[in-house]
Amino acid sequence: MIRVLVVDDSVSFLAAATEVVVASEGFELEAIAATGEEGVELARLRQPDLALVDLNMPGIDGRETAARLAAESSNTVIVLMTAAPDPPRRSNGLFDKRNLSPAALAEIWARAQRASDP
């Protein structure tokens, strides 16, 4: 099972992401966090395989959260997400979190695996 950490300050997105992860074959929800700080601490304790991190959060934002997660564990795949409507932000390699689904989650993982293959 691929263990997933979701970090987002939106309660409604955390609920939706929880449903998607639970419904996705081969994935399990390891933890959810409402702040970047909480996400970093949970990642340290739980060592997830995949972290879905919102870009825009109060406190430490998604980029800083991702940097701290990467410093803690080189084994966690980190995906930055946004719901920003402007295409320039989405085209920067950010996942449009409005499109999160079991199929999208599987594709994210498959791309991460291909990128890590030598």
Segments the model singles out, each with a brief description of its role:
Residues 57:
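Receiver (REC) domain active-site loop signature in two-component systems and cognate sites
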Residues 81-82:
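Hydrophobic/aromatic residues positioned on beta-strands within the core alpha/beta folds
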Residues 91-115:
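Output/docking surface of receiver
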Residues 35-38, 61-65:
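Acidic catalytic/metal-coordinating carboxylates
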Residues 32-50:
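Acidic, metal-coordinating helix/loop segments flanking the phosphotransfer/catalytic sites
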Residues 11-31:
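Two-component/phosphorelay signaling modules centered on CheY-like receiver
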Residues 8, 54:
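Active-site residues of response regulator receiver
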Residues 44-46, 68-75, 85:
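Conserved phosphotransfer cores of two-component systems
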